Amino acid sequence: MSELAETTQFLAGREPWSLLPPGEAAAYARRATASYVRRGTQILTAGSPNSRMHVIRSGAVEVRDADGVLIDHDEEGHCFGQSSILEERPSRFTFTATEDTLLWSFEADVVRQL
């Protein structure tokens, strides 16, 4: 299976892409950027501007508020970063990889189209 086909299949099985008409997930998959994040790396920091939504393809990410309180632990299939884009404000949370993590990321204009 090609990387594009794998990305499309993965996205098509998750919201919001699963709500799109058939075939549209592929258009979004073409706009995804893959990145590998090492365990312990902060991906997004509370209070910082954000222009990308991230989808966890593999690995795990912890979510902490600005005071460092653990809010959530996200794994494969979870998205983060979209709320700060849609609300046009800095991130309220810090996202840190708790495992080596593969992310698929989307620019703000793609998020707004969804």
Please place each PLM-identified region on the residue numbering.
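Cytosolic regulatory regions built on CNB/CRP/Popeye-like sensor folds
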Residues: 1-114
